[in-house]
């Protein structure tokens, strides 16, 4: 799986329509989308999912008023439950990934037995021309999606990844473990593009909001190696407070280069996030990458608490999105906004750092990274 900073063919988004994600605060949300799309479309194509032609007409009006309508935007008329394509959409890979094309297993990802004698295999759509044993074009991993094992409205979203794969003319792969499809969200992982992946125990190994009851730590690690080309996993502990996904790593720690991560910290010992973030920092300090090298760790302070209706929201500067030539950074009108922006600017000197006010948007429990899905070149 390529790192997010590698060249993109496009960014995928879904236009907001489900007011239940932002109850009482939906009105400003389309305008936040317009700002994001205006920025992205200057740098790369935008694949925009709308529920129907009426929704497309409404979206066009907003985009036009925001000076964001562009020939670089392509509309797709697909019904969705929610807009979080990072999690419901497919995960695009580069043209060839480790594990493909074992001659003795035609048409499937290369199964490799682990210590418990289980195999990880998944069907691959075959090219029709020469009977090749592995896809030569783009690859789309279509994991199952069940709304973070929390919400009941997910069945339309579970179909979106396949529609994206077809529109991108990608070979669709259905990852499996022990003969069952794997449930996995894009926000639960982060990769360096060189063989190392970040995830959390709270999200994947907890019995609460359990995605895959049949899978153990070893099963996940084998799946990451076989399907994502990431044979080395760094496990963090708990995510940030208020995250309804139960521990997504994209609110916590992110790769910014093959050997460097940014991680959220909180110096206030009385804050609910202080202990878990400190524990994760210790794990990172003792972690090694796929080559056995120590990570360079850059700390970013959490934003001062963001609350709405007396509820602590999962505001985090880690939920940025890296696109071609630009980085979209969530800000919350908090004193630590400037520290986060300056840190990201130092880490990405060749990219424009664009702050996106997310104080209203975060009421939906997600920000820039949660709503986007990159399609690599």
Q: Where are these predicted regions, by residue range?
A:
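Intrinsic disorder/low-complexity segments
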Residues: 95-137
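The feature marks the mature, well-folded catalytic cores of soluble enzymes
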Residues: 1-97, 135-377
């Amino acid at each position: 799986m390529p790192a997010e900073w590698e060249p993109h063919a496009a960014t995928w988004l879904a236009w907001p329509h489900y007011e239940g994600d932002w109850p009482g605060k939906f009105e400003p949300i389309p305008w936040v989308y317009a700002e994001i799309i205006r920025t992205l479309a200057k740098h790369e194509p935008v694949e925009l999912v709308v529920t129907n032609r009426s929704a497309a007409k409404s979206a066009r009006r907003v985009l036009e008023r925001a000076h964001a309508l562009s020939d670089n935007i392509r509309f797709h008329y697909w019904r969705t439950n929610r807009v979080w394509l990072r999690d419901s959409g497919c995960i695009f890979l580069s043209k060839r990934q480790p594990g493909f094309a074992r001659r003795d297993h035609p048409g499937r990802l290369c199964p490799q037995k682990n210590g418990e004698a289980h195999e990880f295999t998944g069907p691959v759509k075959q090219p029709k021309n020469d009977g090749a044993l592995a896809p030569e074009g783009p690859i789309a991993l279509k994991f199952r999606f069940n709304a973070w094992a929390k919400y009941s409205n997910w069945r339309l979203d579970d179909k979106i990844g396949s529609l994206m794969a077809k529109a991108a003319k990608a070979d669709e792969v259905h990852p499996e473990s022990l003969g069952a499809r794997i449930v996995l969200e894009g926000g639960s992982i982060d990769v360096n593009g060189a063989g190392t992946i970040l995830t959390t125990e709270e999200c994947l190994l907890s019995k609460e909001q359990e995605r895959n009851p049949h899978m153990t730590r070893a099963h996940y690690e084998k799946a990451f190696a076989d399907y994502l080309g990431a044979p080395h996993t760094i496990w963090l502990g708990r995510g940030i407070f208020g995250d309804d996904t139960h521990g997504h790593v994209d609110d916590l720690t992110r790769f910014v280069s093959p050997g460097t991560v940014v991680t959220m910290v909180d110096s206030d010992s009385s804050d609910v996030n202080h202990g878990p973030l400190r524990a994760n920092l210790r794990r990172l300090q003792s972690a090694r990458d796929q080559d056995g090298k120590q990570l360079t760790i850059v700390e970013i302070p959490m934003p001062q608490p963001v609350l709405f209706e007396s509820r602590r929201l999962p505001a985090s500067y880690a939920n940025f999105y890296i696109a071609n030539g630009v980085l979209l950074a969530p800000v919350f009108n908090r004193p630590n906004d400037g520290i986060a922006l300056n840190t990201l600017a130092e880490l990405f000197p060749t990219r424009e750092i664009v702050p996106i006010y997310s104080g209203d948007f975060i009421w939906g429990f997600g920000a820039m990274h949660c709503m986007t899905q990159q399609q690599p070149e």
